[in-house]
A protein has these predicted regions:
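A metal-dependent, Asp-based hydrolase signature
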Residues: 3-35
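Residue-level recognition of short, well-ordered coil/turn positions
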Residues: 10-11, 61, 113
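Short histidine/acidic/glycine/proline-rich micro-motifs that form metal-
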Residues: 2, 38-42, 95
Length: 160
């Protein structure tokens, strides 16, 4: 509940922690605050993904991030290996829209001047891919393996 609201940009982290604490026994309040304050710490880079992103960029492809995330994404993102290769980012909290709603994909296209049929969307959620495809952007469901993704991208004509 709180996470979805933070991703939509309709709740701050402080409000989320307070909301969680209102439903938890006092002995768990500190853990609720830690969860909200440190959500990004256990996230580890996918092996091979930074290299793949760099190769895409070197090959001349545009690389963009469309993420369902809270405002904290702006702090976290620069620490992600390969993030420097991205041409643009669109964070759900900033635009008050979340995947899989079609409007967020349309906003991605208009913000960065993208043509959906010339893009390839990669996401770990099948409903997000299906929604992107309904707006004209083909996609691949990412299962956590960069080498597998590279092979799947070749089927779409991506050369890396």
């Amino acid at each position: 509940l709180e996470w979805a609201k933070m991703d939509r940009g309709s709740m701050t982290e402080e409000e989320a922690a307070a909301s969680m604490c209102s439903r938890l026994p006092e002995c768990l309040h500190e853990q609720a605050h830690l969860l909200v304050d440190r959500w990004d710490r256990p996230i580890l880079p996918v092996p091979g993904m930074a290299e793949l992103v760099r190769k895409l960029k070197e090959a001349g492809y545009g690389v963009y991030l469309l993420s369902n995330a809270s405002y904290r994404q702006h702090e976290y993102w620069p620490r992600v290996p390969g993030s420097e290769c991205f041409d643009g980012t669109l964070i759900s909290a900033d635009v008050k829209l979340v995947k899989p709603c079609a409007e967020i994909y349309e906003l991605l296209y208009s913000t960065f001047g993208l043509i959906p049929g010339e893009c390839l969307f990669i996401d770990d959620s099948a409903p997000n891919i299906e929604s992107a495809e309904r707006t004209g952007m083909p996609g691949i469901v990412f299962h956590g393996d960069a080498d597998e993704l590279r092979s799947e991208m070749k089927a779409f004509g991506v050369k890396v």
